[in-house]
Amino acid sequence: MFLSMAKAKTISKEIPLAEITLRRYEKPSKLSERELVRKLCLSIGLLQPGDSRDIIVDILHVLLMARKQKKLLSSEEIEKEVIDSRKKQRLALHGIASSNIRRQIKRLRDLYLVEKVKNSYRITEFEDLGIIFEEKIEKFYLQSIVDRVKEYFGSVK
């Protein structure tokens, strides 16, 4: 019993407080809107290369379309829009369970791309994604990670 508790403590200390994956791809070119969103998701670690479970791409795309109209969407509305979008593009309807849609929205919220307002969601402050990246991810989230990594580099002699 004592041994398993000791392991649990060790494991909990190994859980990162924050993490981000950044990937560099070729410059954006003549891609469809969905493909641009897909590359963005790959670039910031929301999607893994070769992953066929790409529902997060459609969720972000739907929220970006709603931003143009300054419209907030409930998780049910997001789900409906995602299903419609995937059907139009003749994509498999994998990962469209309500629980998965909410989990993917949470991932977008964790990266400050999406915010919850009452019981609805929107791109943070209906802002441009480039500005969100600079202000929330680059200056705040990424900087806090880099600062902590520097502390570890300074501590290891």
Protein language model annotation of sequence segments:
Residues 1-27, 140-141:
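Eukaryotic partner-binding/assembly regions in large regulatory complexes
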Residues 23-72:
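Short alpha-helical segments that sit at the start of domains
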Residues 53-57, 76, 99-102:
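Non-catalytic, well-ordered alpha-helical scaffold segments
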Residues 69-92:
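Short acidic, hydrophobic short linear motifs in intrinsically disordered regions
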Residues 91-110:
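Short amphipathic alpha-helical interaction segments
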Residues 109-120:
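A short, conserved structural fragment
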Residues 120-130:
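Basic, amphipathic "hinge/linker" alpha-helix immediately C-terminal to the N-terminal HTH DNA-binding motif
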Residues 128-157:
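Short, amphipathic alpha-helical interaction segments positioned at domain boundaries
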